[in-house]
A protein has these predicted regions:
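Structural transition elements
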Residues: 79-119, 138-141
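Ligand-binding "clamshell"
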Residues: 16-31, 175-178, 191-206, 263-267
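Extracellular/periplasmic solute-recognition and catalytic clefts
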Residues: 1-47, 184
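Extracytoplasmic/peripheral linker and loop segments enriched in polar/acidic and small residues
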Residues: 54, 109-110, 158-169, 195-264, ...
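Periplasmic-binding protein-like
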Residues: 46, 50-92, 143-144, 244-252
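Second-shell loop/turn segments in exported
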Residues: 4, 44-48, 55-58, 99-107, ...
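Long beta-strand-rich cores associated with HINT superfamily self-processing modules
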Residues: 260-287
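Ligand/substrate-recognition segments at binding pockets and active sites
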Residues: 14-15, 109-188, 230, 255-258
Length: 287
């Protein structure tokens, strides 16, 4: 952007934006949009300790999604607030007042961690050691990983991170060679049929890397997909969200805050909330 390229289309981190603005001044401009890509942690259903729902829930409850996500958003391109599986504030998303009642999303992190540690003790999983598979890309993977490690350790857990290049990371995720793994759920529309497909039974979707089977979720998914009344569909979708969040096989981290950097000579481009939208360059020109 400083003379070699005209734009960075994937996204820039907050420190990168500070550097670009300092070096380029008025010669750089930025556009921002919340990307419809949710970062999640998928827990392996084959890991013995994770077969206990209380252990999965406790791991989820150790994460401070309120103050913690605000801090994380200052160093990488993640949203500064919690979300369920559906994009927050979208038509079918759980309202905040309902989401924040669910364990792992409450605002009282001290009480949440105290209860989580009691649940781990009850399950015989105090000081649980488990592997966390990370993709060897700085933003936002390393930043999310380091943050999650620190959150879990506050509950006495002992996660061990294994970081691999993309090809090996993808192979490990696909073959289930992990206890927990960073994962993501991209979409181009905030629609439950698109955004909940990842969380139905693994014999119906290849993107369920936890590999669990849940026919109740399948039934709710099919029910909302065939419902044309918005209010009735929303009620079914909320049932799905609450059940999937309670099951805690896939733990939402947050959505992506996408900010692209453009040389100020680039005009006419409008950022989209998906990497696959608005890529025709129609109307884009150099001034």
């Amino acid at each position: 952007i400083g003379g070699q390229i005209m734009a960075e289309w994937r996204g820039t981190s907050p420190p990168e934006r500070v550097m670009l603005k300092k070096e380029m001044g008025d010669d750089v401009s930025f556009q921002a949009k919340t990307l419809m890509t949710l970062w999640v942690v998928s827990l392996n259903s084959k890991t013995e300790a994770f077969k206990n729902k209380k252990v999965r829930q406790a791991i989820n409850m150790c994460i401070d999604r309120h103050a913690g996500l605000k801090k994380l958003a200052k160093i990488t391109f993640t949203a500064p607030r919690p979300s369920g599986y559906l994009l927050y504030n979208s038509t079918y998303a759980l309202p905040d007042e309902e989401l924040y009642k669910i364990p792992g999303f409450t605002k009282d992190i001290d009480a949440s961690r105290k209860k989580a540690m009691a649940m781990l003790k009850e399950a015989g999983a105090e000081g649980l050691e488990f592997t966390y598979s990370n993709r060897a890309v700085s933003h936002p993977y390393d930043h999310i990983a380091i943050w999650l490690m620190s959150e879990w350790k506050k509950c006495g857990l002992k996660p061990k991170m294994m970081t691999n290049p993309t090809s090996k990371f993808v192979k490990i995720r696909r073959e289930g060679g992990f206890d927990a793994t960073i994962d993501w759920a991209p979409s181009f529309l905030p629609d439950p049929t698109l955004m909940h497909f990842k969380y139905i039974s693994s014999d119906r979707t290849a993107s369920n890397y936890s590999k669990y089977i849940d026919r109740d979720l399948d039934k709710l998914f099919d029910g909302q997909a065939g419902e044309t009344d918005v209010a009735k569909r929303k009620a079914i979708v909320h049932q799905f969200e609450k059940k999937a969040l309670e099951n805690a096989w896939v733990l939402p981290v947050t959505y992506t805050d996408r900010v692209i950097a453009l040389n100020s000579k680039v005009k006419g481009y409008v950022i989209a909330n998906s990497h696959i939208l608005n890529n025709t360059w129609r109307g884009v020109y150099l001034d």
